[in-house]
Amino acid sequence: MSIRYESVEKLSEMIKNNEIKPSEVVKDIYDAIEETDPTIKSFLALDKDNAIKKAKELDELQAKGQMEGKLFGIPMGIKDNIITKDVETTCASKMLEGFVPIYESTVMNKLHDENAILIGKLNMDEFAMGGSTETSYFKQTVNPFDHTAVPGGSSGGSAAAVAAGLVPFSLGSDTGGSIRQPAAYCGVVGMKPTYGRVSRFGLVAFASSLDQIGPITRNVKDNAIVLETISGVDRNDSTSAPVEDVDFTSEIGKDIKGLKVALPKEYLGEGINEDVKEAVKNAVETLKSLGAEVDEVSLPNTKYGIPSYYVIASSEASANLARFDGIRYGYHSKEAQSLEELYKMSRSEGFGAEVKRRIFLGTFALSSGYYDAYYKKSQKVRTLIKNDFDKVFENYDVVVGPTAPTTAFNLGDEIDDPLTMYANDLLTTPVNLAGLPGISVPCGQSNGRPIGLQFIGKPFDEKTLYRVAYQYETQFNLHDAYEKL
């Protein structure tokens, strides 16, 4: 019996009841990867020897009845910008090819403490810059629902691997939609937690005021279980919030009668595909049938989210990526004849086109003559966007809308057109700019490609998002679709 499509919750139950050994789970997962991943191309590196070794150690603990840890024996895949000790971490870039970290990220320490098993590292857009996984230096991941379509990005490998049944859960990072958009495109569940909910220690920085790590799963409850495991304050990350640990599963199963839901008119306006609009309208009717009260509201500064985001994110990236200089670690140009040439050539040869574009954009926005006109102005717009959400949340519990304006686009269609590519972030970037939590769940399909529904919550109110997402999932999900892929 293949367990590749079983949930985290079900696998945990099977292991605790001695119905299956961790080593059998791991073998089944690697068999699935061997069979499917040559087509999907979601993994960049496999940690097979260590995974098999750990699984056998857990077998022995299982035999003794010592099955400690929320994720005991559960396999996982990790986006390749999250540091994994002794396992190559490249950020899908030539710049970090062959880089093997000597320390562990906080989220990995937490997952190891709960006895999860690392299967491997997952493909992504280079340094998390992109929305299709097409900027990866190493390979092009495809969408499990349609191999001619992108899986989204930048956490495309993380979403594709979960949808294809290659891991029951993965971790991604979300700077402007990089968990939620690929989750929408691949028909899975992706949570971008509140900024500060999850430690960023060991996440290779793109934009430090926007980045956040979160889980991708095939159902809502699994997602809550994983977020519970990785969240919490961390002394190694000064931006992690000193909030109490939360039982995220405690709200799951509670009804949503009387829950006040806001539907921004801007989220169904210009640029939103008709099939996506229809699916979201149907989802809203479903929420009403479950007892929620849904009203139309306005988030007037939504349209400024993309320009504000790309100035701020690129500015922070230009500073963060200055550390990749060809000297301390990473790609080192062999042709350089001087120190200046070494810097220039290592960075020119080591970074891909999209990363260089954003470094240029960010450096320009921070330059003395343009700082006020671009970076400072973008931060003011960011405040306006946050104020819009604050005003809505005075009267509503949750905001709902599409995750992305369209379904997954075809491979190659937008990679040479950055403005069209950036437009896919219309509905996700405002959430990062405001530091809010957002979750994407499947709500339909168009020509076989999944459509994502996004719920946005108040700061640190992921519990309510899980509550409403779970209730919606009972009425619509793609659980039967995964095994047919």
From Swiss-Prot:
A Pfam family that the UniProt record links to this protein: Amidase
EC code(s) of this entry: 6.3.5.7
Molecular functions (GO terms): ATP binding; glutaminyl-tRNA synthase (glutamine-hydrolyzing) activity
Gene Ontology BP annotations: translation
Enzyme class, UniProt record, top EC level: ligase
Gene3D superfamilies referenced in this protein's UniProt entry, alphabetically: Amidase signature (AS) domain
Source domain of life: Bacteria
Sequence similarity: Belongs to the amidase family. GatA subfamily.
Quaternary context: Heterotrimer of A, B and C subunits.
Database matches in HAMAP family: GatA (MF_00120)
Function, in words: Allows the formation of correctly charged Gln-tRNA(Gln) through the transamidation of misacylated Glu-tRNA(Gln) in organisms which lack glutaminyl-tRNA synthetase. The reaction takes place in the presence of glutamine and ATP through an activated gamma-phospho-Glu-tRNA(Gln).
Protein name per Swiss-Prot or TrEMBL: Glutamyl-tRNA(Gln) amidotransferase subunit A
